[in-house]
Amino acid sequence: ARENINLYDPAEHRSDLSLAQCQKLFDQKFVAGLDKMFMCGNFGEPAAADSAMDIFKYFRTTNSNITLGMNTNGSVRNTAWWRELAQVFNRPLDYVVFSIDGLEDTNHVYRRNTAWHKIVENAESFVAAGGSAHWDMLIYEHNQHQIDQCRQLARDMGFTWFRAKVSKRFVTTPVHFLNPPDGYSLPNTKTGAISCHAMNEQSIYVAANGHVLPCCWFGGEVFSLDAHAQELLSDWAQLSRSWDHAPHRICQATCAEDTQGTSFSKQWKIEEQLK
């Protein structure tokens, strides 16, 4: 994803992986062995990256069976671009997640500087061209009353899936206009064994600046990792060994188990296949 804003270091240059960089990082032999590749921006918008389409085409032509996916706010590019993307995303499990947090009067509260009409036009164009679209909604106080309306609109527009979850971002990044929905309470701190989601699915995370990290949760703090994390990430075997006695706080918060599963497996509140 293109990283337009670095919250931790405003002087950091905007990052954009080029096709040539991706071909160097992921040669054809490596790509041929992959089951899935998807783009999701921790700090940016994947569709805004200059080479996003070319990178997806490279992965598709190199591995015709790979599953391709992308998470987006849907408010960039034009309808022709989204129609072309649908042609590239031509496998049964390919998808685009449109992160839409409400309706025209609420989506922009969290999804800053987005344009509702462009989101609708782009999503409709992608679906009409044969793409599989998923609607993902973060639930806050300001949009909690619109869940059913959003689900119905997703169905009417031809989306394949609708999902909604409560976000903790009003805690981790508190701002005055983001409040939790009614009745929400923070989950208990997990103290069980680490069940690493990334290791279980045998995945890695590559940031827009080319940094290779175990997962997107470490990627979310790529500009602010503490010295202990830097040491662990210099040797991923050391990272996994640490889970038995002193797991890093990111691993503890994300992938520690309790009697009801890990925090990752419990984060989804609503998940409904629409067609």
Task: Show the residue positions of the predicted features.
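Canonical Radical SAM [4Fe-4S] cluster-binding loop centered on the CxxxCxxC motif
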Residues: 1-19, 214-219
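A short acidic, helix-capping loop that chelates divalent metal ions and anchors anionic groups
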Residues: 4-10, 104-110, 173-174
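Short cysteine/histidine-rich metal-coordination sites, predominantly Zn2+-binding motifs
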Residues: 11-21, 267-275
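Radical SAM/AdoMet-radical enzyme domain recognition
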Residues: 15-41, 48-166
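C-terminal accessory region of radical SAM enzymes
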Residues: 122, 129-132, 157-196, 211-274
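Short, acidic, Ser/Thr-enriched surface-loop or helix-capping motifs
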Residues: 206-207
